[in-house]
Design a protein with these regions (language model features):
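Bacterial N-terminal signal peptides
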Residues: 17-28
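N-terminal post-signal-peptidase region of extra-cytosolic proteins
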Residues: 43, 64, 73-75, 83-93, ...
């Protein structure tokens, strides 16, 4: 705060109007500087909350907009995760779609858009290759992203802080910028917006979040239905 006051001194005032304008500018910029300085601390809180949650269950709604093809889509279902390395998106709308990781293998079975096949690949742990929207952005983010404060906001009725994460090495990941909404009460991330390199925007809202609750092992298991062709995409 002292630095902000020093930077706003008027060495050679040009009349009362100039002084008033300068004071107003300083008053407006000081909170913004403070908020931006707090962004790493807010992110640290989100990381700590993420690691405290050994399991998590939530309802999710995904909004996808792709300007390249002029399309938009809304889908929903249940998101489950268990540390380390297990997660599942199980869609209710469209029913039957699933993306899950069992700790070693990532499965994508999307009969609504790719009927008759399931894609499997080996989990690599490399940035940009995880479909886990929490682990991808909360696993050691300070080393991979530049973080800044966007604005105070809310998710539903819950006050939250919106942060922007920009990859330190642009062009190495499939996204250009990520926005996360961190709950002020429990530091859980309740909304994620991914701005992909293609121009598509994917927003995922997490609701009814429950942490450290029992999750059956079957939630992270996938067996291809009879007659479904398995495509191995490991590399």
């Amino acid at each position: 705060m002292t630095t902000a006051r020093r930077s706003c001194r008027v060495a050679d005032p040009r009349g009362l109007a100039w002084v008033a304008a300068t004071v107003a500018l300083c008053a407006a910029s000081a909170p913004a500087l403070a908020q931006n300085a707090s962004a790493p601390a807010i992110l640290d809180g989100a990381v700590a909350a993420f690691h405290r949650a050994t399991t998590l269950r939530a309802d999710f709604t995904q909004y996808l907009r792709d300007p390249m093809v002029g399309s938009s889509d809304t889908s929903s279902g249940e998101f489950l995760r268990q540390s380390p390395g297990k997660f599942a998106f199980r869609w209710r709308h469209p029913a039957g779609d699933v993306i899950l990781a069992d700790g070693q293998v990532l499965w994508a079975y999307l009969p609504s858009s790719s009927p008759g096949q399931a894609v499997r690949s080996t989990l690599t742990g490399r940035p940009g290759e995880s479909a886990d929207v929490l682990a991808e952005f909360l696993d050691d983010p300070a080393q991979r992203f530049l973080v800044s404060y966007v604005r105070p906001d809310s998710v539903g009725a819950r006050p939250a802080d919106e942060l922007a994460l920009v990859p330190r090495q642009q062009g190495t990941l499939p996204y250009r910028r990520v926005l996360i909404w961190v709950d002020r009460a429990d530091s859980l991330v309740r909304r994620v917006e991914i701005n992909e390199g293609s121009g598509a925007v994917r927003r995922i809202l997490l609701d009814q979040i429950r942490v450290n609750v029992p999750i059956p092992a079957s939630a992270f298991m996938f067996r291809p239905p009879k007659g479904v062709r398995v495509v191995d995409a490991s590399h």
